[in-house]
């Protein structure tokens, strides 16, 4: 998941002097405003509307900040032209500090407070006005901080520059089709257009505003919060943001600086006022001064004037201030045309228009008085409209006060009006004194609502404020001032006829003859007078009232459901329908036909508003239709709700004493007949109730409701996010939302287990924490690399210190030379004079030829040395011819020994393919073809004779030693390794001598043994007769200090590093023991010597069991069986049975090359599996005379070294490895990762030859390569499992290199 980096708005450049002067002047003006700066509801609303209207364009400039300098965000107030760094500061300034009008100019296309507008007017206005801003500083000049990029003008503010740039329409060719704004680049215009059409996924839960960015939503949410958690520690003033508080603290900081300065000038005055800088000698005088002149800075002052920001300590001082400072202001009564000079006089006069509450514990005083009190506290300087008193009295807001009525000595007495008492009193008459109490604290001695409102606004300003609802259109207003303006502009013509006092417009109580001017007064009267426990309403009515809210219902079940839902109560008293006293004609009230509790509304407009908001604009049920088509529910309401009917303007029927029926136009002379007639209408309509959708009739309202629910019920499945509670219509949308919003990509360091949230962070971490430097020390004479300086010193001591003038030594004759070129020229004098009689290999020295004969051809007779290098051996006197015998030896697959400790790069048992140009030999024809193509540029199939000399001469890479030429640099590099000889990297820890391989070092270390001629175990003193007993004793006496193998030689007590080294010790000690025993015994008795057949490698106790043959001057011994098969023309047939006292070993099937332990098993195998073969045809397949029988091809897993017979099995096995272990393979030596075991093996080979000058030597045949992958390919092609040197002590696996063993131990056998 990626998220684009959001732009940060750039701060506006302001001069230091200008900023300090503005801060001081601004904080002084704000300090004078006192605590009223957070209570202006008008400003809050304007800020909220400002934010909502510009939520789209406020995002654009922050995104454009990444590309264009002209699109950097700036926030400027459109009234006072002050710039701000963030939208939060601008919103706080507009809501609480801006001295200008809070209303936005509707003619501007972008509001000035939006960051997208940049205080820029509409482009059409700018072009029409000619950029005449009307101010001198906005016209621009020269040398100002913000120059125009299109002309020579510069401006003092960035906002002026943005306005000016819009006139350069030729330089801004891209125009927004939505708001006509101009842009310099198309990408800016396209990104801006997306803000008009893009999705806003961040919605405000308080209002319907939506934003495209989360930070814009956070800024917008601050406009809904009235809390100011940041308090000034000096003046206790609250702020909504830290930036506003810091700006305010600058004023106190300057006051402290002036205080320090004044203290130095006048040391006698110790106390100074923080507001006016007056000094006093005592704290009492300072406190008195603050209480008198600056009460807003005093902690004791908690009462604020409703007309101005002045704060006072007690009520008497506040009232005195109101009479003195605001005595000339006239206040009009909202109920009548009278005016008063003081607010208190208005409140006292309003008592004449209300009936006082019956209990001081009521939390709902008279709606008229409570609403007017709330109005006057919100807008004290505004003259209330006469309509406001009536409209506000119908609002649903509950005043924040409780009224306590005092009458005589019993303040809690219930005031019950007499039946014949007049409701409208004169102005001179007044009720008993009303005492008001605070609903939030224990104060109960407020003489008027004005004092109570002042107390609530100052002491309990953090309490939630009530909303005010218009009773005509049901719109909610934040303050009564807004409600007054709303009614005056929109509903003034509708409000007067309804709310005006007169003889023909009043509300009649159905329980008593009382009449009221508004429906709220009627509800209050019913709740007080007729809802008590002792009230006994008349019986026999079919309508019911709620005793808590005085709402009427048609059925008892509707009333019960209303009480449970609205008042969370089940035990409330139900009020039955009162008796109607018709003295005048009535007007109908309206009920919602779709609500279960059937609420009643006073006008069709209110009912329409209710249905539009709650029932999706369903048409009204009681429209002008015939009586048969009307809804039963609405008809029921119209008939059975005379309890809430209004009086009509005509009084003719009432004056005649008649009671007209509003359903059938009948008239009755007495009320009893009229009531009985209405019950007939009610019973007739309640018999059957029809569905308003399908006209189906139902017997009960419950069945009708259950049926009607089906028409409006739809089911849908939504998928909700558990984190943010957002709903989605499909699972795909939910998953996309979870991936986009609730998914994080983390980066895990496998070296130290730390987690990072970005790729850049982990790259920095790896570069700082895990990048270790490693120094290498190189010898300038031989270019060898060493990790430690001590190793280089030892190398110099043994290699270059003895003869510093001649540091290069010949490995054949020991002669030294001063330069490498002289050594290479000298090496050319050593030609390969000594040839092998069996495989045509040539060697530089006789010792190398003898070693080759012992290891490859099992020839240990020193008589072979007697023959010359190029001499012809004597012919054999036996039956078998030398040529046939040599062919038999070459064809036998078991004739050669293992490849261990071989110096040659080609196995003699494999076919040889020689290059007739340079003499290079290869085991495969493909390798020879690659060699000819790479080094001699001869393609397969071309005539070698015609191209041989020409292509040989064309080689551009020439060897400086032997003058041979090559076509590639790699071929020349590989050829040069043959002149340099094997590199000696293995040093003897006893004498310091170096050897080219670990095998030669092991053979050398044996010569340092002090127990050369002893064949006994030095631990248990038991004699050792064979190599098997030696190995068994070494396993019986393990070396716990040896962490590699766990073994040591029990004869010489040397520590061995591999199983191969242990076998070499056993062979060496047993051969010395056999030689010493034979020399010490006069009769030649002692350890019995075994003799092997040169063809089948069978062992015999007596030399007489073998027939001696001389082939090319070398003696060989063949058993009788091999001689018989040779005479019959067979090769490799069944061998004769071995002597009974010793089991035979090394029996193989000539057809499938399977090895058996005994001759009986081999014979049984031949009869079962190769029955069709006759003895004459049971020999091996005929082939070339120089090629033996090919071995069966097998496949070995590099990972676990398991062998498989076909390619499919190895593929399935490798696939299982990948499923179980994955495709990543780690090198435990350096923690690098590879995607295949072959690459890991190649990497481990590089570890083995670190610091070796870039050469790689085969540990088996010592062939030198310049690339590790070439050596790896060579090992796979030439050497097998039996040639591996290092054995794992904990499992049967073997390895060619020690680094392979170390990596295997750390990965598979780590504790």
From Swiss-Prot:
Lineage, broadest ranks: Eukaryota, Metazoa, Chordata, Craniata, Vertebrata
Subcellular location: Nucleus
Composition bias type Polar residues, residue spans: 110-123, 373-382
GO CC term (a single one): nucleus
Classification via SMART domains: ZnF_C2H2 (SM00355)
Protein name: Zinc finger protein 423
Function as written in the Swiss-Prot or TrEMBL entry: Transcription factor that can both act as an activator or a repressor depending on the context. Plays a central role in BMP signaling and olfactory neurogenesis. Associates with SMADs in response to BMP2 leading to activate transcription of BMP target genes. Acts as a transcriptional repressor via its interaction with EBF1, a transcription factor involved in terminal olfactory receptor neurons differentiation; this interaction preventing EBF1 to bind DNA and activate olfactory-specific genes.
Keywords of this entry: Activator, Developmental protein, Differentiation, DNA-binding, Metal-binding, Neurogenesis, Nucleus, Phosphoprotein, Repeat, Repressor, Transcription, Transcription regulation, Zinc, Zinc-finger
GO terms (BP aspect): brown fat cell differentiation; cerebellar granule cell precursor proliferation; cilium assembly; negative regulation of cold-induced thermogenesis; negative regulation of DNA-templated transcription; Notch signaling pathway; positive regulation of BMP signaling pathway; positive regulation of DNA-templated transcription
Zinc finger extent (C2H2-type): 75-101, 146-168, 174-196, 202-224, 230-252, 271-294, 303-326, 331-353, 436-460, 468-491, 507-530, 544-567, 590-615, 659-681, 689-711, 719-742, 747-770, 777-800, 808-830, 834-857, 913-935, 957-979, 986-1008, 1047-1069, 1091-1109, 1147-1170, 1195-1217, 1225-1247, 1256-1279, 1286-1309
Entry GO MF terms: DNA-binding transcription factor activity, RNA polymerase II-specific; identical protein binding; protein-containing complex binding; sequence-specific DNA binding; zinc ion binding
Tissue specificity field: Expressed in brain, eye, olfactory epithelium, spleen and heart. Expressed in the basal layer, consisting of neural precursor cells and immature sensory neurons of the olfactory epithelium, but not in the mature receptor cells.
Source species: Rattus norvegicus (Rat)
Gene3D superfamilies: Classic Zinc Finger (3.30.160.60)
Biased composition (Low complexity): 390-404, 631-642
Origin: domain of life: Eukaryota
Residue stretches of biased makeup (Basic residues): 1-11
Modification Phosphoserine, positions: 55, 58, 631, 1081
Record's comment describing the protein's domains: Uses different DNA- and protein-binding zinc fingers to regulate the distinct BMP-Smad and Olf signaling pathways. C2H2-type zinc fingers 14-19 mediate the interaction with SMAD1 and SMAD4, while zinc fingers 28-30 mediate the interaction with EBF1. zinc fingers 2-8 bind the 5'-CCGCCC-3' DNA sequence in concert with EBF1, while zinc fingers 9-13 bind BMP target gene promoters in concert with SMADs.
UniProt xrefs under Pfam families: zf-C2H2, zf-C2H2_6
């Amino acid at each position: 998941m990626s998220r684009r980096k959001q732009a940060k708005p750039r701060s506006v450049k302001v001069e230091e002097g200008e900023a300090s002067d503005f801060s001081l002047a601004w904080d002084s003006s704000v300090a004078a405003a006192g605590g009223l700066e957070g209570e202006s509801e008008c400003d809050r609303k304007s800020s909220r509307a400002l934010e909502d209207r510009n939520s789209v364009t406020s995002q654009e400039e922050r995104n454009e900040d990444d590309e264009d300098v002209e699109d950097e965000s700036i926030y400027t107030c459109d009234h006072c032209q002050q710039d701000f760094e963030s939208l939060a500061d601008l919103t706080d300034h507009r809501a609480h500090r801006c001295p200008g009008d809070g209303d936005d100019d509707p003619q501007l296309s972008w509001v000035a407070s939006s960051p997208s507008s940049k205080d820029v007017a509409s482009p059409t206005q700018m072009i029409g006005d000619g950029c005449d801003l009307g101010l001198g500083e906005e016209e621009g000049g020269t040398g100002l901080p913000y120059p125009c990029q299109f002309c020579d003008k510069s401006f003092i503010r960035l906002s002026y520059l943005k306005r000016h740039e819009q006139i350069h329409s030729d330089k801004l060719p891209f125009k927004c089709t939505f708001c006509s704004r101009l842009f310099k680049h198309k990408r800016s215009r396209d990104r801006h257009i997306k803000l008009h059409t893009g999705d806003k996924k961040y919605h405000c839960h308080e209002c319907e505003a939506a934003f495209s960015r989360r930070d814009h939503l956070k800024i917008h949410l601050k406009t809904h919060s009235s809390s100011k958690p940041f308090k000034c520690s000096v003046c206790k003033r609250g702020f909504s943001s830290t930036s506003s508080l810091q700006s305010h603290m600058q004023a106190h900081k300057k006051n402290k600086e002036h205080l320090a300065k004044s203290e130095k000038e006048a040391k006698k005055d110790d106390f100074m006022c923080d507001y006016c800088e007056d000094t006093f000698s005592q704290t009492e005088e300072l406190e008195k001064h603050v209480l008198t002149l600056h009460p807003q800075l005093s902690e004791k002052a908690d009462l604020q004037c409703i007309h101005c920001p002045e704060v006072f300590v007690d009520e008497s001082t506040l009232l005195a201030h109101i009479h003195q400072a605001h005595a000339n202001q006239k206040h009009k009564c909202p109920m009548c045309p009278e005016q008063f000079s003081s607010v208190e006089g208005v409140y006292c006069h309003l008592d004449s228009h209300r009936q006082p509450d019956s209990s001081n514990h009521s939390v709902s005083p008279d709606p008229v008085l409570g609403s007017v009190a709330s109005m006057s506290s919100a807008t004290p300087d505004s003259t209330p409209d006469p309509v406001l008193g009536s409209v506000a009295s119908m609002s649903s807001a509950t005043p924040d006060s409780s009224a306590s009525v005092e009458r005589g000595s019993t303040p809690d007495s219930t005031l019950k009006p007499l039946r014949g008492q007049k409701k409208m009193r004169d102005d001179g008459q007044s009720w008993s004194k009303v005492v008001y109490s605070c609903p939030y604290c224990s104060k109960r001695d407020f003489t008027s609502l004005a004092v109570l409102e002042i107390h609530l606004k100052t002491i309990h300003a953090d309490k939630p404020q009530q909303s005010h609802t218009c009773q005509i259109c049901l719109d909610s207003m934040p303050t009564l001032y807004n409600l007054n303006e709303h009614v005056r502009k929109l509903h003034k013509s509708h409000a007067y006829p309804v709310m005006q006092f007169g003889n023909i417009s009043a509300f009649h109580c159905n329980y008593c003859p009382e009449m009221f001017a508004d429906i709220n007064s009627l509800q209050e009267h019913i709740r007080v007078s007729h809802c008590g426990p002792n009230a006994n309403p008349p019986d026999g009515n079919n309508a019911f009232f709620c005793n808590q809210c005085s709402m009427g219902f048609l059925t008892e079940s509707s009333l019960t459901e209303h009480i449970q839902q609205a008042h969370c109560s089940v035990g409330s008293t139900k009020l039955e329908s009162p008796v109607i006293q018709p003295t005048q004609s009535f007007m109908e009230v309206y009920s919602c036909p779709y609500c279960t509790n059937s609420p009643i509304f006073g006008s069709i407009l209110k009912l329409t508003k209710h249905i539009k908001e709650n029932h999706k604009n369903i048409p009204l049920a009681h429209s002008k239709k015939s009586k048969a088509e009307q809804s039963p529910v609405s008809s029921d309401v119209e008939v059975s709700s005379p309890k809430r009917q209004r009086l009509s303007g005509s009084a003719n029927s009432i004056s005649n004493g008649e009671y007209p029926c509003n359903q059938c136009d009948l008239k009755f002379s007495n009320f009893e007949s009229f009531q009985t007639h209405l019950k007939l209408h009610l019973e007739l309509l309640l018999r059957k109730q029809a569905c308003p959708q399908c006209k189906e009739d139902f017997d009960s309202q419950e069945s009708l409701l259950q049926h009607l629910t089906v028409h409006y019920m739809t089911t849908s499945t939504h998928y909700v996010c558990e984190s943010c509670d957002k709903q989605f219509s499909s699972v795909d949308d939910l998953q996309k939302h979870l991936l986009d919003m609730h998914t994080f990509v983390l980066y895990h360091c496998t070296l130290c287990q730390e987690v990072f949230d970005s790729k850049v962070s982990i790259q920095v971490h790896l570069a700082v924490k895990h990048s270790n430097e490693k120094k290498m020390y190189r010898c300038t004479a031989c270019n060898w690399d060493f990790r430690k300086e001590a190793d280089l010193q030892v190398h110099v001591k043994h290699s270059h210190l003895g003869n510093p003038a001649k540091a290069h030594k010949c490995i054949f004759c020991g002669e030294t030379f001063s330069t490498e070129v002289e050594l290479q020229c000298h090496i050319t004098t050593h030609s390969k004079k000594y040839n092998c009689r069996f495989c045509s290999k040539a060697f530089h020295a006789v010792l190398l030829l003898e070693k080759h004969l012992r290891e490859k051809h099992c020839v240990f007779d020193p008589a072979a040395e007697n023959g010359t290098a190029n001499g012809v051996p004597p012919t054999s006197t036996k039956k078998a011819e030398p040529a046939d015998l040599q062919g038999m030896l070459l064809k036998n697959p078991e004739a050669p020994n293992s490849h261990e400790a071989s110096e040659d790069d080609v196995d003699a048992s494999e076919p040889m393919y020689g290059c007739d140009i340079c003499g290079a030999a290869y085991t495969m024809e493909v390798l020879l073809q690659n060699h000819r193509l790479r080094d001699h540029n001869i393609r397969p199939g071309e005539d070698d004779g015609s191209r041989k000399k020409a292509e040989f001469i064309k080689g551009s890479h020439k060897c400086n030693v032997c003058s041979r030429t090559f076509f590639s640099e790699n071929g020349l590099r590989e050829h040069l390794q043959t002149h340099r000889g094997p590199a000696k990297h293995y040093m003897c820890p006893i004498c310091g001598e170096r050897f080219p391989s670990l095998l030669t070092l092991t053979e050398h270390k044996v010569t340092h043994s002090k127990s050369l001629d002893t064949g006994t175990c030095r631990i248990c003193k038991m004699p050792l007769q064979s190599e098997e007993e030696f190995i068994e004793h070494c396993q019986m006496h393990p070396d716990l200090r040896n962490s590699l193998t766990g073994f040591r030689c029990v004869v010489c007590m040397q520590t061995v590093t591999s199983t191969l080294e242990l076998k070499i010790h056993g062979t060496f000690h047993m051969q010395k023991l056999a030689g010493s025993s034979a020399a010490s015994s006069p009769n030649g008795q002692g350890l019995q010597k075994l003799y092997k057949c040169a063809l089948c490698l069978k062992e015999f106790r007596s030399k007489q069991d073998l027939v001696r043959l001389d082939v090319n001057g070398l003696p060989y011994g063949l058993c009788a069986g091999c001689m018989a098969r040779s005479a019959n023309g067979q090769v490799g047939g069944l061998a004769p049975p071995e002597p009974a006292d010793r089991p035979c070993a090394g029996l193989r099937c000539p057809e499938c090359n399977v090895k058996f332990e005994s001759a009986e098993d081999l014979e049984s195998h031949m009869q079962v599996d190769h029955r069709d073969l006759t003895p004459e045809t049971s020999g091996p397949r005929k082939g070339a005379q120089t090629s033996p029988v090919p071995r069966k091809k097998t496949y070995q897993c590099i990972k676990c070294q398991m062998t498989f017979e076909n390619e499919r099995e190895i593929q399935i096995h490798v696939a299982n490895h990948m499923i179980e272990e994955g495709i990543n393979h780690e090198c435990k030596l350096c923690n690098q990762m590879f995607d295949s075991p072959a690459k890991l093996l190649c990497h481990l080979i590089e570890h083995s030859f670190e610091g070796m000058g870039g050469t790689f030597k085969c540990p088996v045949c010592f062939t030198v390569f310049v690339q590790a992958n070439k050596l790896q390919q060579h090992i796979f092609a030439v050497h097998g499992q039996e040639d591996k040197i290092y054995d794992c002590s904990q499992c049967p696996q073997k390895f060619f290199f020690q680094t392979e063993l170390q990596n295997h131990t750390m990965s598979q056998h780590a504790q």
